[in-house]
Every structure is written in C-alpha cells, then in structure tokens.
Curated annotation (Swiss-Prot):
Protein's membrane topology: Peripheral membrane protein
Reaction catalysis annotation: ATP + H2O + cellular proteinSide 1 = ADP + phosphate + cellular proteinSide 2
Name by which UniProt lists this protein: Protein translocase subunit SecA
EC number: 7.4.2.8
UniProt entry keywords in alphabetical sequence: ATP-binding, Cell inner membrane, Cell membrane, Cytoplasm, Membrane, Metal-binding, Nucleotide-binding, Protein transport, Translocase, Translocation, Transport, Zinc
Alphabetical list of CDD domains matching this protein: DEXDc_SecA, SF2_C_secA
Family to which this protein belongs: Belongs to the SecA family.
GO biological process: intracellular protein transmembrane transport; protein import; protein targeting; protein transport by the Sec complex
Entry's cofactor comment: May bind 1 zinc ion per subunit.
Organism classification: Bacteria, Pseudomonadati, Pseudomonadota, Alphaproteobacteria, Rhodospirillales
Region annotation (Disordered) ranges: 827-869
Keyword Zinc part of the UniProt annotation: yes
Gene name as annotated: secA
C-alpha cells in the first residue's frame, strides 16, 4: 500500500530511468538536421571519423549521440524507416547493458541497429542472437542494408555453414546467429588442436533477441557435444521389466516439481529386485560400485512415472520422439539426456539407441555470462526482472510505446470441463468471424490445436488455419497473414515468435510469395501498388471489426508466456482484445486446487456450459503462477550453483588448453609433469622419514617399469648402506631423463616437440571427457546425501574438487608414461573427425571418438590385455588387444 503511494508521488524506478534518457534523445534529435544535409558518401564517411575519435581516446559514450544520429539517417535512406524517440530510448538501454522490454510491433529489430553500430566501431565484433536460423537470416539480410551503407561488414551463422564460412562470419563487425550455433561453436573451438582452426574471436558484446526465451526458458538446457558410449541396451530392458513390480508406496512423485524419488521402502524394494535379477554388485544400492545400477533404476522410474506417451513424447517409426513443451512440436533428432531416452525406448518396446557420452558441455547461463557486455530485448521480461538481475546482472527497463496501447483484456472465463471450454471458444470464434474480426487462438500442443480445428469444422463450418509448420519460413508467412479480416489462426503459443501480425496482412511477405522471380522493375512497382491498396482496404475492415482478437485456451505456469500471447494484438496503437478460456481439467488448475474450485462452482449452482468470470479468479490464478515462477527460479538458481562448480573447472581446462595451443614448445611443461610423477611414485613407496626396512622397493621397481619402461636395480639400491630416499629419487630422475634425452636424440627435437604437444592435448581431452562422465554420475546421486543431514551442494563441491585433482594427477602420469613408452613412425596425421553437438535432451548423432595421435605406437613386447604398454605396434584396423572386440582405432587407439 505504502509502495503504491510512493510510486504515485515520486514515480517508479522505471519511470526515473526513462526520464533520464530524455536529455540524450533530445541531443540526438538536435543532430538530425545536420546529418540530413550530408550526401550518401559523407554520411558513410562518418564511420571512419567516429573510429578515429575512439582511437584518439574518446569513449563510446562520448561518440554515442553522433553515432545514433548517423544510424537513424542511414535507416531512413536504406529502409525508409526512421527511429522513433522511444526506439532511441530502447537503443540507449541496450547500449547500457540492460534488457529493453518493448511491446510487440514496436520495432525491436530496428532498435538493435543503434547499439550494434556504436559498439561495432571498436572493431571487436558484436553478436546479435536470435532463437532460430530463419530469424537470424531474415534480420541479417534486412539490417545489413544499414550496416553496409555505413561501411560495416555483416555475417550470419546458420547450421549448414562450414568452418571457413563460420570463421569469416565471426570476423565481421556484426554477426547474427542462434544461441545454439554460437554455443556449439564455442565448445567445438575448445576441442580443436590448432589456433588457426578456431572460428570465434574473443567475446565482446552480445544483444539477445527474445532474451526471456533464451536466458530463462532455455536456461537449464545444456549444450552438449557427445560421442557414442558403450551399448547398455540389455541393462535398460532388464531394469524396465522390474518397474511394473514397484507399488505407489515405493516412490514419491511431485507433479509440481516434475520429480520422483524412491522412498525408504522403495529403495529396499528396488535393491531387492535388482539383486534378484543379478544386476547388483556386492553391498547396497548406494555404494560407488553400484552407481550404474542406481542410475538405470532412477531413469526407469522417471520414464514410467513422469513421462506420458503423446504428452511428453510420441512413438513413431520405431522411435521415441520428444514433444516440445513450449511449442507442442515433435522434435525429430533430439534425445533426452542421462539415459532417460533409452529408458523410454525400453518402456515402449522400440529399438534402444546407444547412449552418448558427453565430450563437452555448457549451459546458456554460463555461456552468455562470458560476454563482458550483454543486453537483451523482448516484449515480456518484467515478470522475471529479479532473475535477470540475480543471475545475469541485467536490469529490465520497460520502454514506453510509441502510441498508447488500447487493447482490451477481458477477465478469464472458467468452465468445469474442457469440453464446455472448447465449445465456448468455438462459439466465440464463429461470432468474431461473422463480423470480419481476425482471431488468433493460442494452444499448448499440436494435438489440442487439431482437436479445436476439427470441432470448429464440424460445429461452426469455420475452416481455421492450423499452424504446426516444421519450417520457420512457412510458419512466419501464416502468422504474418493472421491479421486479414475474418482470418482464424490456431497456433501453439510460441509458434511464429519474432514475426509481427499486421492488420490487413504483411506487404513484404505477400510480395515475396506473389511476385514472379523474373519480374521487371515496372511489374514490381505495379504489384507493390496493387498489394498495398489491397492491404490498406483489408486493414480498414479489420480495424472496423475491432482489430485482432486473441484467445488463450489455458493459462501457462508462467505469466510471461500468457503475456506473450496477449502481446500479439494491439500493436502500434491498433485496437484489439484478448481473453483466456479455462477449465478445471487444465494442468495449472488441476495442480493448484481445482478440487476446491470445483466444489465452489457446484455450490454456486453453475449449469453446464456456464462459466464463472470474476477479477478474483484472475488474481488467484496469478498468485498460483507466481508460486510456480518462484519455484522454477529457485530450481534454475540451484542448478546454476551446481553448474558453476563444473564451470570453474571448465574454465581452467579450456585456459590451459588454449595456452598449450599458443605454445610451440611444451617441453618444459612435460618435464615438470615428469618430475612430479617421479616424486609421487617415490613418495608412494618410500614415505618421508620411513626406515629403509619400511620401504616398498619391489613396488617402486614395478611402478618404474610400468610408467617409464625402465628395469632398474632399485631393490639393490635400497639395500646399500646409508642410502637415503633423496638419493633414490636422484638416481631415478637421472635414468629417466637419460632415456628421454636418448629418445630426443634419435628422433630430433622438432619431432619430439610436435609429439609432446599433440599427446598432451589429446590426453587432456580424453581425461576431461572421462571426468565429465564421473561428474554426471556424482551429480545424479548427490541429492541423496541430504538424507544423511549433509548439504548436497557442499558435498558436490568437495568431491568434484577431489576428482579434478585426481584427474590432473592421472593426466601427468598418463602423459609421462605414453611419452616414455612410445616409438615414432613418420606417417602424415589423419584429419580429426568433426564432433557433433546438441542441446539438452538433444543427443542426435554420435560424435567424435578422439582420433589417435599421429605417428605414435608403443614399443613391441608380449601383449597382456590389461597392460597397454606390452602391446607393441598395433595396426589401426586390428582388434584391440584389451579384449573389447572393437577395432584398435575405435578403442585404445583412439586414446593415444
């Protein structure tokens, strides 16, 4: 109450920020007459002039007014569009490293040209991030006219681009691309072996379009580059057979949190079932040796209790296909991670595809936090302002609309059943169409879209346009024409995002569709005039009918997604309306107290087909949504804390890797590693201050033979009178260094330097891959520590640190052992295969297997399966001596 009074007296914080921008906007406007009088050549020449001012020590803020005035004039000349004052404000907010909330139709794409041009003058490159390839390509082609007029280069990253094309696009002043492509390029770059093969430059500034979709909705989506792991389909099938034997008391399911865990009784029961099936090693289910069995039992439970066929996934052509929860589309080629997809395949009795092992991964949260400067645009961000600030340090500023918004939002209508709800929606649509009012209906899935469309065809004779396109170009055309009088478009709520619905239709879309490719300039002009007149006529009809009417078929967990649907109408001061039709069967209503609401409706004597409509209902629903939003925020925040642990380790590994790639001579690093390994081996068998009779001389001799390939008289050394452990260390060091010096003399220093660098990078990659797998397994079971009154996050931090230290120790030993036991042949190196990437539940195709180190083979001795150092030279296509049944090049030959 007091907050509301204070806001009326002093204005909100947002109002104060907007007011503070007015002075700068006035200064830009004052420059307009000056730039208007310039010739095209003189206007373009302002770019080198502004760059020279930066070179002389001025800051971006010093040249901002001149830069914004220049872009505005260039847009007028190339696009025929002049930035409004509110668009200048949006540009200022973006340049300030904040999120600009701008309503649909306010021209966010044009707004971005202002800060993009200004920041591109530094020469460090600006990334403009969109949600799909179509929008990246469209925006790049559209806005490139402005940038190129002013002498800047523009690139676009799309899926089909090869490394050469990507490198060229990233080298441009302005680069458009999707969040997935940019993230995968970062991961792939950190798997390359030569600096010149990397495609990205150091990060400088990114503007994220639809920032809420990318940084909130997809925040938990890790980008993963994977390789194929061992086939464990038989284990998934065996565990799946146990699931029907569980009873509801064996697990606790939280529908709100979409999670399921075994109860104490359930843990005992599944342990007993696994032991009966011969799937459990000795000890209990939660011991380290049984981590694989626990993993499969957990994923099997999730598959059977949390995931419903035709809701979360569908079965098609002997495959389990994910259904996108935001768009309702089938997501071909994507797979749930952590073995969940295999558990679903076992449940449905389809072919089980091999699991993929993570080679590299990063979440969008951590990827975008690497940019020194970050900003974003969207029509809906204020409801998540706290999360943007807490996670990314981004303030949200609501930009005023250019014209007052006159859309009428009606109160929700709540029906008892979904059948009554859909009948009421069909009736409302028929009424709108009768008066020529265009209607957009938002649903949560393709199935619901098709159900409503069929209902309308059979009961009202209305033939709606159902939007379930798999191609963004087609989707964009349908959504762009949804403002034609009498049009009825049914779409999943997120479909077509990024494309405006203009009353009367979209001129550019119609020109692209109706103008022949070989049209002459005269034919083009005539067609444009004809279409423009037709669109204006239809716009007048749509306006007279009340503008676009938006209908929501149910509330989402997030108010933001509801607001996105509403925001489709009422653009640029146009009239419009919106209403939501709900039923007690809807997910949100069912999860949050529909029983209480049902009994209340019965007491009110609500007849079939009648709805309850009251502002109180809206408020109650908003409170429920706020609870879900807060819970989801806490989940994302908690996951980020865990991911930050891995992120710190990832940064260390990637920085070390880059340092190795920059350095041509890593002999000093290798020598340091070798010395540490020697000291570790000696100290392990000859502890400090131990008496000679306590020394494990035989063990030391065996380890020296294993690691360095040297048969030294260590037992004799240890029996000498007065020998000290330091002397043993000195003798061992001397003999090892002599062996390595002889190897260098035999092959030459240049060859050894190349081999050292190649081996070090490759072994580091292999061990990082193994470490990621260990971290995944640790993460899956860590929440159970809470039962022992221990904090899972602290446990994860300490254990993952120990695992990281172990990885580094193992790395030193493996590099040292490989270099000490290799013999070289001078074959040309084969090109490494390209890894493939995917997002989150996305594990499309197997990726890389590691690729052997060029020209390296162990010395030939008698082969023992468990001792690779005894295998000698193994042909790449020969079966691996370890007994795996795989070819050597796909097994130990892939690891160096």
């Amino acid at each position: 109450m007091f907050g509301a009074i204070a806001r009326r007296l002093f204005g909100s914080a947002n109002d104060r920020i907007v007011k503070s921008l007015v002075k700068t906007v006035a200064a830009i406007n004052a420059k307009e007459s000056e730039v208007q009088g310039l010739s095209d050549a003189d206007l373009a020449a302002r770019t080198p002039w502004l760059k020279s001012r930066l070179a002389e020590g001025e800051t971006l803020d010093d040249i901002l007014v001149d830069a914004f005035a220049t872009v505005r004039e260039a847009a007028k000349r190339t696009l025929g569009q002049r930035h409004y004052d509110v668009q200048l404000m949006g540009g200022l907010v973006l340049h300030g490293g904040k999120i600009a909330e701008m309503r649909t139709g306010e021209g966010k794409t044009l707004v971005a040209t202002l800060p993009v041009y200004l920041n591109a003058l530094t020469g460090k490159g600006v990334h403009v991030v969109t949600v799909n390839d179509y929008l990246a390509k469209r925006d790049a082609e559209w806005m490139a006219k402005v940038y190129r007029f002013l002498g800047l280069t523009v690139g676009v990253i799309i899926h089909e681009l090869d490394d050469g094309g990507r490198r060229a696009a990233y080298a441009c002043d302005v680069t458009y691309g999707t969040n997935n492509e940019l993230g995968f390029d970062f991961l792939r770059d950190n798997m390359k072996y030569r600096l010149e093969d990397m495609v990205q430059r150091p990060f400088a500034y990114a503007i994220v379009d639809e920032v809420d979709s990318i940084l909130i909705d997809e925040a938990r989506t890790p980008l993963i580059i994977s390789g194929q792991a061992e086939d464990s389909s038989a284990l998934y099938q065996a565990v799946d057979k146990l699931m029907p034997r569980l009873v509801p008391a064996d697990y606790e399911k939280d529908e709100k949190a979409r999670s399921v865990t075994y109860t104490e009784e359930g843990s005992d029961h599944i342990e007993e079932l696994l032991r009966e099936a011969g799937l459990l090693a000795e000890g209990n289910l939660y011991e380290t040796r049984n981590v694989t069995a626990l993993h499969h039992a957990t994923q099997g439970l999730r598959a059977h209790t949390l995931f419903e066929r035709d809701v979360h996934y569908m079965v098609r052509d002997d495959k389990v296909v994910i259904i996108d929860e935001f768009t309702g589309r089938a997501m071909e080629g994507r797979r749930f991670s952590d073995g969940l997809h295999q558990a679903l395949e076992a449940k449905e009795g389809v072919s089980i595809q091999p699991e993929n092992q993570t080679l590299a991964s990063i979440t969008f949260q951590n990827y975008f936090r690497m940019y020194p400067k970050l900003s974003g645009m969207t029509g809906t961000a204020l409801t998540e302002a706290n999360e943007f600030m807490e996670i990314y340090g981004l303030a949200v500023v609501e930009i005023p609309t250019n014209r007052p918004m006159i859309r009428k939002d009606k109160d929700d209508e709540v029906y008892r059943t979904s059948r009554e709800k859909y009948e009421a929606i069909a009736k409302q649509i028929a009424e709108c169409q009768k008066r020529g009012q265009p209607v957009l209906v938002g649903t949560t899935s393709i199935e619901k879209s098709e159900y409503l469309a069929e209902l309308m065809r059979t009961t009202t004779k209305v033939k709606p346009q159902v939007l379930n396109a798999r191609y963004h170009e087609q989707e964009a055309f349908i959504i762009a024409q949804a403002g034609v009088p009498g049009a009825v478009t049914i779409a999943t709520n997120m479909a077509g995002r990024g494309t405006d619905i203009q009353l009367g239709g979209n001129l550019d879309m119609r020109m692209a569709r109706e103008l022949p490719a070989d049209a002459t300039p005269e034919q083009r002009a005539a067609k444009e005039a004809e279409l423009r007149a037709d669109i204006e006529k239809k716009k007048a009809q749509a306006l007279a009918a009340g503008g676009l009417y938006v209908i929501g078929t149910e509330r989402h967990e997030s108010r933001r997604i509801d607001n996105q649907l509403r925001g489709r109408t009422g653009r640029q001061g146009d009239p419009g309306g919106s209403s939501f039709y709900l039923s007690l069967d809807d997910d949100l209503m069912r999860i949050f107290g529909s029983e209480r609401m049902d009994s209340m409706l019965r007491k009110l004597g609500l007849e079939e087909g009648e709805a309850i409509v009251h502002p109180w209902v809206n408020k109650a629903l908003e409170k429920a949504q706020q609870k879900v939003e807060a819970r989801n925020f806490d989940t994302r925040k908690n996951l980020l804390k865990f991911d930050d642990v891995m992120n710190d380790q990832r940064k260390v590994v990637y920085e070390q890797r880059r340092d190795l790639m920059v350095t041509t001579d890593v002999s000093e690093t290798v020598a340091d590693m070798r010395q540490e390994v020697i000291e570790d081996i000696v100290h392990a068998h000859i502890p400090p201050k131990a008496m000679p009779e306590e020394w494990d001389s035989a063990g030391l001799a065996e380890d020296v033979r294993r690691v360095f390939g040297l048969d030294l008289p260590i037992i004799d050394w240890a029996s000498e009178d007065g020998i000290a452990n330091e002397e043993i260390l000195e003798r061992l060091t001397k003999d090892v260094e002599a062996k390595m010096a002889a190897k260098e003399a035999e092959y030459g220093a240049d060859v050894m330097r190349m081999v050292e660098k190649s081996l070090l990078l490759q072994i580091l990659d292999g061990m990082w891959k193994e470490h990621l797998l260990h971290l995944e397994h640790l993460r899956q079971g860590i929440s159970l520590r809470a039962f022992g009154q221990r904090d899972p996050l602290n446990e994860y931090k300490s254990e993952s640190f120990e695992m990281f230290q172990t990885m580094l120790s193992d790395l030193r030993e493996r590099v040292t052992m490989t270099l000490a036991n290799v013999q070289l042949r001078m074959d040309p190196p084969p090109p490494p295969p390209e890894p493939q990437g995917f997002a989150e539940h996305v594990e499309p195709e197997p990726a890389i297997g590691g690729g052997g180190v060029p020209g390296v083979a162990p010395a030939a001795t008698d082969r023992e399966a468990g001792h690779p150092e005894t295998w000698g030279k193994v042909a790449r296509n020969e079966l691996c001596p370890c007994g795996s049944g795989k070819k050597y090049k796909h097994c130990h030959g892939a690891m160096g």
